[in-house]
């Protein structure tokens, strides 16, 4: 864990050095699970931040040591929803279909439910699924819910946001197109992999509606660039919509959807085995994943 852009530190060591050890906090299990940490709520978050700020230098983790690697910053997602927040992407889709944007898109922030058990972390390989010939990526911001609730208002939404990370919404475009031609989905066209990382930056650092530069690169070549603040739908809109008459939970992940021109589909380009995708978002970091070999 890190704070204020400093190097990562040993959270367990910091917590013990600060003299904490409340047996009511799930017996300390949250020390090895970011989801449990999020579920504990704001009071614990403040204690953790204080312990980190007071940590001596010998708790800093050497990221250059052999064998060090970043893991997925969220060890378990409670759920995964991926929205379609950017009008620029929707307009490109309508142009490809020679149609117009559906009226309902302007009425509510639509989303699909993804596979929250198929989450990759930084530098994890994305296996090429045996059922697709057209693999793609999508550059997105992901928001992690911190405090659950129901019927959340736009005005109170910021209190429910834990933080943000970079998200790669891997997509099997041929399968996705066939599924959605049957008026449902996507399903297998998306469910095989979603990547998150390299870290979660909390909302107290970025604000609840951050406007951040977003860049996607494949094999070092820039494919697209955008700003998260250009989204038509805000995080408050998404939280208010999802929580209308139903509960949302700590650790729920909301993907923003990709901006126009920040995926292969919008650019008429496709991935191939061995490609390295780098997605970078200002103030969060760079998420890198490589595409695995195509199955025989």
Where are each of the predicted segments found?
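N-terminal non-catalytic cap/leader segment that marks the start of a structured domain
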Residues: 1-109, 276-280
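Catalytic-pocket segment enriched in acidic/His residues
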Residues: 42-49, 53, 63-64, 173-296
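A generic local secondary-structure boundary/capping motif
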Residues: 69-72, 99-102, 126-135, 140-141, ...
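Residue "hotspots" at secondary-structure boundaries inside conserved domains
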Residues: 72, 78, 104, 133-135, ...
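A short secondary-structure junction signal
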Residues: 91-95, 122-125, 130-131, 152-157, ...
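A gly/proline- and charged-residue-enriched helix-loop-helix capping module
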Residues: 102-123
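Short, structured patches in soluble enzyme cores that scaffold and shape functional sites
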Residues: 114-116, 123, 130, 137-147, ...
């Amino acid at each position: 864990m890190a704070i204020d852009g400093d190097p990562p530190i040993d959270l367990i060591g910091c917590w013990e050095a600060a003299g904490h050890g409340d047996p009511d906090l799930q017996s300390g299990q949250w020390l090895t699970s970011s989801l449990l940490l999020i579920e504990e709520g704001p009071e614990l978050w403040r204690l953790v931040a204080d312990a980190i700020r007071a940590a001596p230098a010998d708790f800093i983790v050497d990221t250059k040591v052999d064998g060090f690697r970043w893991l997925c910053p969220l060890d378990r997602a409670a759920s995964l929803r991926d929205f379609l927040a950017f009008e620029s992407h929707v307009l490109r889709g309508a142009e490809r279909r020679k149609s117009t944007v559906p009226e309902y898109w302007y009425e509510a922030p639509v989303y699909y439910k993804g596979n929250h058990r198929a989450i990759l972390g930084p530098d994890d390989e994305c296996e090429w699924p045996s059922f697709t010939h057209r693999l793609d990526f999508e550059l997105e911001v992901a928001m992690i819910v911190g405090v659950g609730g129901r019927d959340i208002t736009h005005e109170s939404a910021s209190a429910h946001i834990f933080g943000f990370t970079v998200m790669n919404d891997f997509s099997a475009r041929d399968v996705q197109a066939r599924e959605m031609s049957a008026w449902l989905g996507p399903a297998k066209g998306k469910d095989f992999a979603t990547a998150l990382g390299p870290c979660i930056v909390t909302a107290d650092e970025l604000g609840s509606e951050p406007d951040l530069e977003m860049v996607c690169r494949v094999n070092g070549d820039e494919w697209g660039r955008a700003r998260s603040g250009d989204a038509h739908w805000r995080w408050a809109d998404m939280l208010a919509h999802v929580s209308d008459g139903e509960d949302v939970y700590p650790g729920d992940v909301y993907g923003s959807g990709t901006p126009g021109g920040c995926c292969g589909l919008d650019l008429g380009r496709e991935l191939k085995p061995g490609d390295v995708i780098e997605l970078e978002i200002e103030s969060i970091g760079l998420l890198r994943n490589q595409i695995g070999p195509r199955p025989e």
